[in-house]
UniProtKB/Swiss-Prot annotation:
GO molecular function annotations of the record: 2 iron, 2 sulfur cluster binding; 4 iron, 4 sulfur cluster binding; biotin synthase activity; metal ion binding
Assembly: Homodimer.
Entry function: Catalyzes the conversion of dethiobiotin (DTB) to biotin by the insertion of a sulfur atom into dethiobiotin via a radical-based mechanism.
Family membership: Belongs to the radical SAM superfamily. Biotin synthase family.
Name the UniProt record assigns to this protein: Biotin synthase
Length: 5
């Protein structure tokens, strides 16, 4: 999973 905020 890619980092996302």
């Amino acid at each position: 999973m890619a980092h996302s905020s």
